[in-house]
């Protein structure tokens, strides 16, 4: 059964169709939520909020072929809400400390562990240092492999805005990564 048919059935309250949609989308949505939020707990909350909203609001979806953009839009809105809540709790120093911990490892054991996970961890730390809007664009463009047009549609932005955010986010990440390398030496 194709996705459009699943969505039509889901609109009529079919739980099995919802389960199939969940199976298809929960991994990419969780990955994106994790990269946007920066931690597993928030990503799990965002994922849950995303699918609850999806189930409750599926009737508002006009075009079944727009479902992917629609559900990623719900996820990014939930992530924004969670980040706003979290920003009241966590000082910016925590992000800087996290990058410092990743970039500086003195013992051989820590160095070995760093080697095994360095690329992924350093990129995630650099990503977490970006502002929310830049992080969303980077995650959707690179991790979800959406085109600039698709990212713009998902986030409700102009394509030029997406290109601009990508440009400045890349520059900031490059600077963060270069600073991390300098600290290691």
Question: What is each of the regions a protein language model found here?
Answer:
Residues 11-20, 30-49, 159, 182-185:
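Short, charged helix-capping/linker segments at alpha-helix termini
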Residues 11-12, 51-66, 85:
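Sigma70-family region 2
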Residues 22-40, 57, 127, 172, ...:
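Amphipathic, Lys/Arg- and hydrophobic-enriched alpha-helical face
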Residues 31, 45-52, 65-77:
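Structural recognition of an alpha-helix C-terminal capping motif at a helix-to-coil junction
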Residues 1, 41, 121, 125-161, ...:
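Helix-turn-helix DNA-binding module
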Residues 5-9, 90-97, 122-125, 149, ...:
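C-terminal edge and immediately downstream basic/flexible tail or linker adjoining helix-turn-helix-like DNA-binding
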Residues 59-63, 73-93, 168:
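Arg/Lys-rich amphipathic alpha helix in sigma70-family domain 2
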Residues 82-104, 114, 118:
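Short, basic/polar amphipathic helix motif occurring as a linker/hinge flanking DNA-binding modules
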């Amino acid at each position: 059964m194709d996705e459009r048919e699943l969505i039509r059935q889901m609109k009529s309250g079919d739980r099995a169709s919802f389960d199939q949609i969940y199976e298809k989308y929960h991994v990419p949505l969780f990955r994106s939520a994790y990269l946007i939020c920066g931690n597993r707990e928030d990503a799990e909350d965002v994922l849950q909020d995303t699918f609850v909203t999806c189930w409750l609001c599926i009737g508002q979806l006009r075009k079944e072929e727009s479902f992917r953009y629609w559900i990623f839009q719900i996820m990014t809105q939930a992530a924004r809400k969670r980040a706003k809540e979290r920003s009241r709790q966590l000082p910016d120093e925590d992000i800087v400390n996290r990058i410092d911990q990743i970039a500086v490892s003195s013992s051989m054991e820590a160095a070995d562990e760093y080697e095994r996970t360095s690329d992924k961890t350093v990129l995630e730390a650099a990503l977490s240092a970006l502002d929310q809007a830049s992080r969303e664009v980077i995650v959707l463009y690179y991790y979800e492999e959406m085109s600039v047009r698709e990212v713009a549609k998902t986030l409700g932005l102009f394509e030029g805005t997406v290109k601009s955010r990508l440009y400045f986010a890349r520059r900031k990440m490059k600077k963060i990564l270069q600073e991390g390398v300098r600290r290691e030496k």
